[in-house]
């Protein structure tokens, strides 16, 4: 299969903002793709060569890409950089220079060759790796047409930006290989328990939908985490959960999924990054506490060894370094609070109700000084729920997660729902909780902020449309060093136009690819004529905006943009807020 077909698809995707047209373009390509290549096409179309949990990245800088381009075109790197400044994008610059120079490809690029070469680049490490990576990529460019060059450059520098998410790809796979969108749910279940969309696509293309239904949980493949909805009124929480709930402490730490098979451990973050090397001490503690073959979830916190008190979340962030040393282990001692189990000795437990899973935990976890079960209480009245909430706050927690005890209280991998409800009340405002919002744009600063942004345009996520919808412009709560930090984080994700997945009425001075999640608080949610979250849902020609938004100082690197607060959550928060006021 020629790579030019992928490049042509990418151009179509880039030029449309219609999800229907994007889906159809993907359907057409998937139907043309040989089954043995479908996984590679899926990976390449999301800008990767393997699922995120493998940690396989290109580690290929823009500077290296320019050097490769310079070699092929026989022009100076300075001339290329000048063209990049003019076009605002390395891919566009490369395409234009190829066309101007009349470069003739030295061969025909295939999907197989592109994938194989990019994978080799990602796997090349150690002494001399920079030179070898450069040689490999240069050979690809020699065989590329101008359009192919554009997308190869964007791919290798991890800036493909096609505006498609997992949901759009799953819709297209369902239509292409089963003839209808309704089978997407089966594909999504397989993806949620394997976290590998390319793998699911290949099983579907080669063996059909029944084989996808038979995809099982495996040690080493992370399960996409179950997510909680949020409510602020205890009586409503209990009513929503059937009058009775299992209330658990919501620890202010890092959610970690632990896989164990014998002495082999895998630790995955909330966004499915492999963080095994960052917690060698936690693994030693877990060896004493958890079964030989299992998948469990826990909240890791930093504690004060003398008192056992939980230290602030910021202390835990000091453990998120590439190389953990004895210093980190001594200064930031870890404890783990286990709150769920999804797999035990070959058995998938995700379809068992929560009370059964909790009982299995209690029977199989050995409590030690550093490993414990999450603090829990069964509550069936508001007074007990309120009392337990205050106890959690006093013990240094964020609040509670209230869990359904009903028969349908399965572990909903990759889904957000009311089987789990967060209760994190903020007494200083009407806002029931902080919001985790995605940076999608910025507005220029003035005075002391000249040269930096004045405010950031923040958005929630709508999984139904696979779009990011604006909620507020935030310009307060930032410390002096935040401006430099955010500038460094955002500059490589700058766009010269609004991202196709961003739904915004406002015109930002700078647009960004949605990737960075920040924790935002505020006074209350109000009807807004300029923000698109909840547009027409509460009132015609009005959305929902956050009044007096403020950055809490917390960067949510543990969350993907698709893990941000959803539109539906914000609508529910607004309704709860109205009820509290009344």
From Swiss-Prot:
Keywords: ATP-binding, Cell cycle, Cell division, DNA damage, DNA recombination, DNA repair, DNA replication, Ligase, Magnesium, Metal-binding, Nucleotide-binding
Active-site positions on this chain: 250 (n6-amp-lysine intermediate)
Top EC group: ligase
EC code(s) of this entry: 6.5.1.1
Reaction catalysis annotation: ATP + (deoxyribonucleotide)n-3'-hydroxyl + 5'-phospho-(deoxyribonucleotide)m = (deoxyribonucleotide)n+m + AMP + diphosphate
Family membership: Belongs to the ATP-dependent DNA ligase family.
Protein purpose: DNA ligase that seals nicks in double-stranded DNA during DNA replication, DNA recombination and DNA repair.
DNA damage among keywords: yes
Record-level GO BP terms: cell division; DNA biosynthetic process; DNA recombination; DNA repair; lagging strand elongation
Alphabetical list of PANTHER family matching this protein: DNA LIGASE 1 (PTHR45674:SF4), DNA LIGASE 1/3 FAMILY MEMBER (PTHR45674)
Gene: lig
Necessary cofactors: Mg(2+)
Pfam families, per the entry: DNA_ligase_A_C, DNA_ligase_A_M, DNA_ligase_A_N
Protein residues bound to ATP: 248, 255, 270, 299, 339, 416, 422
GO molecular-function term, one example from the UniProt record: ATP binding
Lineage: Bacteria, Pseudomonadati, Aquificota, Aquificia, Aquificales
Official protein name in the record: Probable DNA ligase
């Amino acid at each position: 299969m020629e790579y030019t077909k992928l490049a042509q698809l990418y151009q179509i995707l880039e030029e449309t903002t219609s999800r229907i047209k994007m889906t159809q373009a993907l359907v057409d390509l998937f139907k043309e793709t040989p089954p043995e290549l479908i996984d590679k096409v899926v990976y390449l179309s999301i800008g990767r060569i393997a699922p995120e949990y493998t940690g396989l990245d290109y580690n290929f800088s823009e500077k290296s890409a320019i050097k490769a381009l310079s070699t092929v075109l026989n022009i100076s790197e300075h001339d290329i950089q000048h063209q990049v400044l003019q076009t605002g994008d390395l891919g566009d610059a490369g395409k234009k220079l190829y066309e101007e120079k009349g470069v003739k490809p030295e061969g025909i690029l295939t999907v197989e060759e592109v994938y194989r070469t990019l994978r080799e680049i990602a796997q090349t490490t150690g002494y001399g790796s920079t030179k070898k990576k450069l040689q490999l990529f240069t050979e690809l460019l020699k065989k590329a047409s101008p359009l192919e060059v554009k997308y190869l450059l964007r791919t290798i520098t991890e800036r493909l930006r096609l505006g498609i998410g997992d949901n759009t790809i799953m819709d297209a796979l369902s239509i292409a290989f089963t003839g209808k969108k309704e089978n997407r749910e089966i594909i999504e279940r397989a993806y949620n328990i394997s976290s590998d969309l390319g793998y699911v696509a290949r099983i579907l293309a080669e063996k059909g939908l029944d084989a996808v239904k038979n995809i099982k949980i495996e040690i080493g493949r992370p399960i996409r985490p179950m997510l909680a909805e949020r409510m602020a009124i205890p009586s409503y929480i209990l009513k929503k959960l059937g009058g009775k709930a299992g209330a658990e402490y919501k620890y202010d730490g890092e959610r970690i999924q632990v896989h164990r098979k014998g002495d082999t451990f895998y630790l995955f973050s909330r966004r499915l990054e492999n963080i095994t090397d960052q917690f060698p001490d936690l693994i030693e503690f877990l060896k004493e506490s958890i079964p030989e073959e299992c998948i469990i979830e826990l909240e890791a916190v930093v504690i004060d060894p003398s008192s056992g008190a939980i230290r602030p979340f910021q202390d835990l962030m000091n453990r998120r370094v590439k190389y953990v040393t004895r210093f980190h282990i001594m200064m930031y001692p870890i404890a783990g609070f286990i709150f769920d189990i999804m797999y035990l000795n070959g058995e998938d437990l995700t379809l068992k109700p929560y009370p059964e899973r909790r009982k299995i935990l209690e029977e199989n976890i050995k409590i030690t000084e550093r490993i414990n079960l999450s603090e829990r209480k069964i509550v069936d009245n508001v007074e007990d729920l309120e009392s337990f909430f205050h106890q959690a706050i006093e013990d240094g927690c964020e609040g509670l997660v209230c869990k359904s005890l009903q028969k349908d209280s399965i572990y909903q991998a990759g889904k957000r729902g009311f089987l789990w409800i967060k209760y994190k009340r903020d007494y200083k405002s009407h806002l029931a909780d902080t919001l985790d919002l995605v940076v999608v744009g910025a507005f220029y600063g003035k005075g002391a902020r000249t040269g930096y942004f004045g405010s950031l345009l923040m958005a929630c996520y709508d999984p139904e449309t696979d779009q990011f919808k604006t909620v507020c412009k935030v310009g307060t709560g930032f410390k002096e060093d935040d401006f430099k930090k955010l500038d460094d984080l955002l500059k490589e994700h700058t766009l010269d136009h609004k991202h196709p997945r961003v739904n915004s009425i406002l015109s930002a001075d700078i647009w960004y690819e949605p990737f960075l999640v920040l924790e935002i608080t505020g006074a209350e949610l109000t009807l807004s004529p300029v923000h698109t979250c909840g547009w027409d849902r509460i009132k015609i020609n009005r959305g929902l905006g956050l009044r007096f938004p403020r950055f809490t100082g917390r960067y949510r690197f543990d969350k993907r943009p698709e893990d941000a607060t959803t539109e539906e959550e914000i609508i529910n928060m607004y309704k709860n807020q109205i009820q509290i006021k009344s």
